[in-house]
Amino acid sequence: MLVLIRPKATQNFIQLINQLIPYSPNLIIDEATQVVPLPTSIKENSPALFIILAVELDDIGSNGDLLPVLYAMKRHWSAILKHSVAMLMVKSPNEWHTKTFSSWLIFNLNQWGCRFIGHPLVEMIPNLENLGRWEKTTNIAKIQLLHDFSQKAVERLMSFDHCLSPKPKLAVLHASSRKTSNTFMLWHLVKEHLKQIDIEEFHVANGTIIDCIGCPYQTCVYYGRQKSCFYGGDMIRELIPAIEQADALLWLCPNYNDAVSANLMAVINRLTAYYRTHSFNGKQLFSIVVSGNSGGDAVARQLIDALCINKGFQLPPKFCLSAIAYDPGSILEADDIKKRAASYAAQITDSLFISQSIEPSCRKGEPHL
C-alpha cells in the first residue's frame, strides 16, 4: 500500500509532486483527521506500507500541519510502522532546512519503527541549486535531474528488498579505548547476544586515517573505480574491503560536543571515493551512541545525514541505541542497560539474519555520481 503524506501544501507543490511520483498512491493524507487505522495485512520480512512524505517548508524550516499528522500516525499506525519503509520529498523557500528538517523527521519516525531506503531524500531549494554539481558533471538540466532522482528514489521504495542472510556480516567501527570507553562497554553487552552474526571490529586509532581534502571530482572518481583513494593507507587496505563485504555497519560513537568523533568522521569522509562508483543502497546502518549528559539524538542525526541521506545506507527500524554515562564504567550501572542491550541485539539480528539460504539481491544499486 502506497501512502502519500503532504500536509499544508500549495497547489504548485501538489502538482510538482504528482509529476515526480510515477505511481498512483492508494491513500493521500493532507491532514491529521485522514490518518485512520489501516486494514493492511502484514507479511513477515515484507513491507506492508510504503510511505512518501512530501513536505513543503516555510521560511523557518517548519510545516504547521505536520506535527498533528505525525501524532496521529503514532496513535493509529504504531504496529504497522514497524512494517513500513519510507522516503521524503522536501521543498524549502530558501537554501536552508531541507537536510536538518529531514534528519529530524527521519530520526523520529525511525524511533517509532519506520525503515528508510538509502538516499531517502529528494530535496528542492530555489532554482534547484542543490543539483548544480550534478548538472555540471552530467550536462543534464536540473529539472530533468529532479525528475530522474525522484523516479529512482520511488522505484527503490516500491521495490524495496529487505536483504536477509543466513551468514550476515557486520563491520563495527570505533575509535574508543577498550578499557575505559562506556560506548565500547555497551557494545560488548550487545555483542554477547549476536551469536548468529559474523562480526569484524576495526579500531580507528589517532592518525591512522587521514581526512579527505576534497580532490577534484574526476580525480575522486578515478580512484573510486579502483576501490582506492589518493591517500591509500588503512582505509584502502582494511576498511574498504571489509565494508564492501559487510551487510551492515555499526558505528560506536561517544558523544563529542554533540558530534561524531574526528577519527570516525575521517572514515565517513574518505568513503566518498568508493561511493562515487559503488552503491551502499543494500547495506544497513546501525549505531551505539553514549553521551556524558545529553545530545545522543544530535549524533544519531549526524549519522543519518552523512550515511543514510548522503551515502545511501538503509536505515533499519530503531537503528540507534543511545545511553547516558559520564564516569568510566558507569554505563554498566545504567537502568535496564542489559535488557536494552539484549533488545537492540535482537533488533540487529531481525534486520540481518534468516535461517534459510536466500540470494541477497539487495546488494545491487547504482553509484550516486
Locations of the language-model features?
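A short small-residue
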Residues: I125-W134, A248, L321-P328
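N-terminal beta1-alpha1-beta2 submodule of the flavodoxin-like/Rossmannoid cofactor-binding fold
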Residues: M1-R75, D148-Y274, S330-L369
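Short, flexible coil/linker segments at domain boundaries that flank nucleotide/cofactor-interacting
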Residues: L81-K82, C163-K167, F280-N281
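Short, glycine-/small-residue-rich phosphate/pyrophosphate-handling segment
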Residues: S84-N130, I140-F149, F280-C320
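General detector of N-terminal leader/presequence modules that precede the first folded domain
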Residues: E44-N45, I60, D65-S92, W96-K99, ...
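Structural alpha-beta junctions
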Residues: I21-E31, A79-I80, F107-G118, E192-I199, ...
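Long, contiguous alpha-helical scaffold regions
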Residues: T272-E366
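A generic structural motif
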Residues: I28-V36, F116-P126, E201-A205, L315-I324
